[in-house]
């Protein structure tokens, strides 16, 4: 039983293959047309490249396993150039302190980011005091403790990194580390201008004759503070106190000297000239916005000429509607009066006539 093949080349050529057994037995590979020939050559080249890549990977794994990891040829030079400014090698090992021993393997050490307080701060010597670290040369080695003055001995304070730690073979001049003195506070001027709204008179400024009012000579580290005396409510209250604004009457000084422990020293109250002003009145409210103009009314179209109705007042008024007929006794009386002048007539027919008409 034959069927159409699944591969495109055989199907395009019109080949028919059996139901089973077509895998790997395509007939287009034996075709001599140009397209089939190019496809066959390309498949052969790709298979050869795959074999070469596999062999190269196996050889590289075998080489690394026998010789160990190696850096590229330019990697050591670049690493040494980049780390030469911030990395120093360890000194040579001296076994037993007798002469220089064999050169040990040099490892690179990166210094800490912050300035180091010195190796002697973290290690203790035989006497229990901070001594030289293991990175310094021994006592018998050149540049040891015997060749250095007592001023160089480590102190309990931060020190800059020493160049002899990185280069122990070079003898550098020994310089004593200066010891900074205690920090002295800088005194400030009394009553500096800090933007306060009050202005003091000349007698309220700190004077030279009163030692109690000169705190900066006794305590130079104190910050100038000018406390004010609160306004007593029992004294007279004026309009300013009624408004809720206390008026400044005087001031007192609090001594910061440790020798005066008797408490607060109050001074007689003196009147000060307040320089503050009453708050400005609130701004007037903005005027209301003007009302929008009414929309213009549309003009009515004129269907009649303007002089058409001017002659209507000359027309006579319409006559009133006729009144309905009414029969009353007054009408009969007038009629009787007119008939009496000609001749007398019997009253019964005259009286019956309106009755007949009404009937």
Swiss-Prot record:
Pfam families: DM. It comes from the Eukaryota. It is found in: Nucleus. Residues 348-359 have a biased composition (Polar residues). Residues 111-149, 262-359 are annotated as: Disordered. The keyword Transmembrane does not apply. GO terms for cellular component: nucleus. One of its GO terms (biological process) is regulation of DNA-templated transcription. Transmembrane segments: none annotated. Keywords: DNA-binding, Metal-binding, Nucleus, Transcription, Transcription regulation, Zinc. One of its GO terms (molecular function) is DNA binding. Residues 277-299, 315-325 have a biased composition (Pro residues). Brain. SUPFAM superfamilies: Cysteine-rich DNA binding domain, (DM domain). Residues 7-54 bind DNA. Belongs to the DMRT family. This is Doublesex- and mab-3-related transcription factor B1. It comes from Mus musculus. The gene is Dmrtb1.
């Amino acid at each position: 039983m034959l069927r159409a093949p699944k591969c495109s080349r055989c199907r395009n050529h019109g080949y028919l293959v059996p139901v089973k057994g077509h895998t790997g037995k395509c007939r287009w590979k034996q075709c001599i047309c140009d397209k089939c020939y190019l496809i066959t050559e390309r498949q052969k080249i790709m298979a050869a490249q795959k074999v070469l890549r596999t062999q190269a990977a196996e050889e590289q794994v075998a080489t690394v396993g026998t010789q160990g990891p190696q850096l590229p040829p330019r990697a050591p030079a670049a690493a040494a150039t980049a780390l030469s400014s911030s990395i120093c090698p360890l000194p040579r090992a001296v076994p037993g302190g007798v002469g220089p021993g064999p050169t040990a393997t040099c490892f690179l050490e990166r210094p800490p980011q912050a300035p180091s307080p010195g190796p002697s701060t973290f290690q203790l010597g035989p006497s229990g005091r901070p001594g030289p670290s293991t990175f310094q040369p021994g006592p018998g080695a050149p540049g040891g403790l015997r060749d250095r003055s007592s001023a160089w001995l480590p102190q309990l304070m931060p020190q800059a990194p020493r160049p002899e730690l990185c280069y122990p073979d070079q003898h550098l001049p020994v310089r004593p580390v200066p010891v900074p003195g205690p920090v002295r506070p800088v005194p400030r001027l009394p009553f500096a201008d800090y933007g306060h709204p009050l202005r003091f008179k000349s007698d309220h400024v700190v004077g030279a004759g009163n030692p109690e009012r000169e705190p900066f000579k006794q305590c130079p580290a104190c910050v100038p503070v000018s406390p004010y005396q609160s306004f007593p409510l029992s004294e007279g209250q004026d309009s300013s106190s009624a408004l809720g604004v206390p008026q400044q009457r005087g001031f007192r000084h609090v001594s910061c000297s440790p020798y005066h422990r008797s408490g607060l020293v109050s001074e007689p109250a003196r009147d000060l000239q307040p320089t503050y002003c009453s708050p400005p009145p609130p701004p007037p409210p903005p005027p209301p916005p003007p009302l929008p103009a009414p929309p213009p009314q549309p003009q009515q179209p004129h269907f009649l000429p303007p002089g058409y109705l001017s002659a209507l007042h000359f027309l006579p008024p319409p006559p009133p509607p006729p009144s309905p007929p009414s029969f009353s006794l007054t009408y009969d009386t007038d009629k009787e009066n007119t008939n009496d002048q000609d001749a007398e007539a019997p009253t019964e027919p005259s009286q019956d006539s309106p009755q007949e008409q009404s009937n």
